[in-house]
């Protein structure tokens, strides 16, 4: 019996509501394991996970590493800075070299959109996209959804306002796809210069005012101003951006009283979010980090168990 009909996790696009629910239910079980004193299982014993990060990462790489190790996999982190890539080797050559080592899953983060999909075409193991350019970041969307569902009890019919640098955000794209698939009502709030062309065609409501966009929102998801991906002047100044699009306690009052405050990290305090909000009672930013490990455990077991020998008795229950 195939529990999950996909060999890879390249993006949220292509996943059904049932696929997403399956992964979230599986992740709920992983949360229980992560909160035990004895956190390690033997579910993926004897299997190998290679983390291939071409972009700097702290949270995501550590989260994937911890997820694999808690499931008993052998985990290798490849340092791109010291690799053959720096000597001119192409992504395909690197992929073929690693594939010859017979890993069971490759986790890749790359600055180019489509890198994970390309890798999946060239290797015989499963591939998980840990972020590819401005395209997608599927496990971030899944962990955000898990955080919301555990706090609100559902994803359907809730209002989620995604605010900030939507243009450069793969997190925004994956969240929009997932939340729409699960029946949520999605808003984006940003200056016109930080919205991609055709954003309204993705099934979202577009706002240019924080007060209007946050009105009656159940969830406020702030995005980092990604200045490293900007080649021009997208905002007049950081100070002006914060004045109009930063989230402080006063601005948050426009949302529902019990609205969740989220941020995928890393945060720029005083740029898109005030410390009083990031550290406040409505913030679930720390919970997002915890849910990240659980979601990645669920993804790893789902892909590797489906691909290999079927469910083991000590695995996660969905």
From Swiss-Prot:
The gene is pyrB. Keywords: Pyrimidine biosynthesis, Transferase. It is an enzyme of class 2 (transferase). Signal peptide: none annotated. GO terms for molecular function: amino acid binding; aspartate carbamoyltransferase activity. It catalyses: carbamoyl phosphate + L-aspartate = N-carbamoyl-L-aspartate + phosphate + H(+). One of its GO terms (cellular component) is cytosol. Pathway: Pyrimidine metabolism; UMP biosynthesis via de novo pathway; (S)-dihydroorotate from bicarbonate: step 2/3. Its EC number is 2.1.3.2. Carbamoyl phosphate binds at residues 59-60, 109, 137, 140, 265-266. PROSITE patterns: CARBAMOYLTRANSFERASE. This is Aspartate carbamoyltransferase catalytic subunit. The keyword Transferase applies. The keyword Transferase applies. It comes from Rhizobium leguminosarum bv. trifolii (strain WSM2304). Heterododecamer (2C3:3R2) of six catalytic PyrB chains organized as two trimers (C3), and six regulatory PyrI chains organized as three dimers (R2). InterPro entries: Asp/Orn_carbamoyltranf_P-bd, Asp/Orn_carbamoylTrfase, Asp/Orn_carbamoylTrfase_sf, Asp_carbamoyltransf, Asp_carbamoyltransf_Asp/Orn-bd. GO terms for biological process: 'de novo' pyrimidine nucleobase biosynthetic process; 'de novo' UMP biosynthetic process; amino acid metabolic process. Catalyzes the condensation of carbamoyl phosphate and aspartate to form carbamoyl aspartate and inorganic phosphate, the committed step in the de novo pyrimidine nucleotide biosynthesis pathway.
């Amino acid at each position: 019996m195939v529990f999950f009909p996909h060999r890879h996790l390249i993006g949220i696009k292509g996943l059904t509501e049932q696929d997403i629910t399956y992964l979230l239910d599986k992740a709920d079980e992983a949360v229980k394991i992560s909160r035990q004193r004895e956190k390690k299982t033997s579910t993926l014993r004897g299997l190998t996970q290679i983390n291939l990060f071409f972009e700097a990462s702290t949270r995501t790489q550590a989260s994937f590493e911890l997820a694999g190790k808690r499931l008993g996999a052998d985990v290798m982190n490849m340092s791109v800075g010291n690799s053959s890539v720096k000597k001119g080797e192409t992504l395909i050559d690197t992929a073929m070299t690693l594939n010859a080592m017979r890993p069971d899953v490759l986790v890749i983060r790359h600055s180019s959109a489509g890198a994970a999909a390309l890798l999946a075409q060239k290797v015989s193991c499963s591939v998980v996209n840990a972020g590819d350019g401005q395209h997608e970041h599927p496990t971030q969307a899944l962990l955000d959804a898990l955080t919301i569902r555990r706090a609100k009890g559902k994803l359907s019919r809730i209002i989620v306002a995604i605010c900030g640098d939507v243009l450069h955000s793969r997190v925004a794209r994956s969240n929009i796809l997932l939340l729409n698939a699960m029946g949520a009502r999605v808003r984006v709030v940003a200056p016109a210069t930080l919205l991609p062309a055709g954003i309204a065609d993705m099934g979202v409501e577009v706002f240019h005012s924080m007060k209007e966009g946050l009105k009656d929102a159940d969830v406020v998801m702030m995005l980092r101003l990604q200045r490293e991906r900007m080649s021009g002047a997208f905002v007049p100044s950081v100070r002006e951006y914060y004045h109009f699009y930063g989230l402080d306690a006063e601005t948050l009052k426009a949302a529902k009283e019990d609205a969740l405050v989220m941020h995928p990290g890393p945060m720029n305090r005083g740029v898109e979010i005030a410390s009083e909000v990031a550290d406040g009672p409505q913030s679930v930013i720390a919970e997002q980090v915890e849910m990240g490990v659980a979601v990645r455990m669920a993804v790893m077991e789902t892909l590797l168990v489906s691909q290999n020998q079927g469910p083991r008795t000590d695995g996660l229950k969905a």
